[in-house]
């Protein structure tokens, strides 16, 4: 059978940075932290460079079959990711010196409620990227984590309105009954305004170093949620909702606050050579989003 990729010469010569496939759907067993592998439904991209300016093209089936072997006979961890990239280059030894792979999937975690001890599933979007170039291996991990953000400015304005309502209610009284105030504060006439809040999402990308023996997906998610303190919940009873309201009231934040809190936490981590983050507050007051971005700020590192 004719093999055009091997036998034909390019009509127009030139080297290409990446050639391969995207939007490959496949199941994967993913090894994270110290947990048993979890099956995920992934979307993959695989590429090698075309370093021979005269070659017609690469051998895409060689990349696909190696990816399929990983899916059916192994699990995705740092070791197999390295081997996969090396296999891409070896199978194209006459054409390529660099390889790239990207996996996108949702990673499911059981999350406990704040007070009631109930549990539910949460799905976190995850991206794993591997690069191999002339023996230099790099791996990136990205997670997206939803949380709630309550506007500090709106909270201050709401408090002012409550103060004004209190003054109007009791301004003419020289003595105020404690029980009456207690009941008034628990009524809609007492709490006349509430601050606006919204579901928000932070995207965090880190470059892993040799201290990582596996993908620290859960560790990174836990770090983000612990830092922000208001993660979106799964199973919720009334006592959990009340605790969530308390956490939001005690952790008011602009997008700048969220970005700085995470920046500080990520700077303390030794497993990450670099980091990049983007905070997205999907405003309930405005028709636009409030966004803050930052990086570790190292030379030659990520750019915002």
Curated annotation (Swiss-Prot):
Pathway annotation from the record: Cofactor biosynthesis; 7,8-dihydroneopterin triphosphate biosynthesis; 7,8-dihydroneopterin triphosphate from GTP: step 1/1
Cysteines joined through disulfide linkages: none
InterPro entries: GTP_cyclohydrolase_FolE2, GTP_cyclohydrolase_FolE2/MptA
Hydrolase listed as a keyword: yes
One of the GO biological process terms: tetrahydrofolate biosynthetic process
EC number of this enzyme: 3.5.4.16
Gene3D superfamilies with a match to the protein in the record: Urate Oxidase
Catalytically driven reaction(s): GTP + H2O = 7,8-dihydroneopterin 3'-triphosphate + formate + H(+)
Role according to the record: Converts GTP to 7,8-dihydroneopterin triphosphate.
Family: Belongs to the GTP cyclohydrolase IV family.
Protein name according to UniProt: GTP cyclohydrolase FolE2
Native source species: Psychromonas ingrahamii (strain DSM 17664 / CCUG 51855 / 37)
Lineage, top ranks: Bacteria, Pseudomonadati, Pseudomonadota, Gammaproteobacteria, Alteromonadales
Gene name for this UniProt entry: folE2
């Amino acid at each position: 059978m004719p093999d055009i990729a091997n036998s034909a010469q390019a009509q127009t010569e030139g080297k290409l940075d990446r050639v391969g496939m995207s939007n490959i759907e496949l199941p994967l067993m993913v090894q994270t932290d110290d947990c048993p592998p979890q099956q995920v439904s992934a979307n993959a991209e695989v590429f090698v460079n075309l370093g021979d300016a005269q070659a017609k093209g690469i051998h895409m089936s060689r990349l696909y079959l190696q990816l399929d072997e990983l899916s059916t006979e192994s699990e995705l961890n740092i070791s197999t990711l390295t081997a996969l990239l090396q296999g891409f280059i070896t199978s194209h030894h006459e054409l390529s010196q660099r390889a790239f792979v990207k996996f996108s999937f949702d990673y499911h975690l059981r999350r406990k409620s704040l007070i009631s001890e109930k549990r539910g599933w949460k799905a976190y979007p995850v991206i794993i990227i591997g690069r191999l170039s002339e023996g230099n291996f790099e791996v990136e991990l990205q997670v997206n984590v939803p949380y709630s953000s309550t506007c500090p400015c709106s909270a201050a304005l709401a408090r002012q309105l409550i103060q004004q309502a209190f003054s109007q209610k009791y301004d003419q009284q020289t003595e105020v009954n404690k029980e009456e105030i207690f009941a008034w504060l628990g009524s809609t006439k007492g709490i006349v305004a509430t601050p606006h809040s919204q579901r928000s999402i932070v995207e965090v990308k880190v470059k892993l170093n040799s201290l990582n023996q596996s993908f620290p997906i859960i560790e990174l998610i836990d770090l983000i949620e612990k830092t922000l303190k208001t993660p979106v919940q799964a199973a919720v009873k009334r006592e959990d909702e009340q605790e969530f309201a308390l956490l939001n009231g005690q952790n008011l934040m602009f997008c700048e606050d969220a970005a700085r809190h995470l920046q500080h936490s990520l700077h303390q981590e030794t497993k990450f050579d670099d980091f990049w983050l983007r905070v997205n507050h999907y405003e309930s007051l405005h028709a636009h989003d409030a966004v803050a971005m930052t990086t570790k700020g190292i030379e030659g590192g990520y750019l915002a």
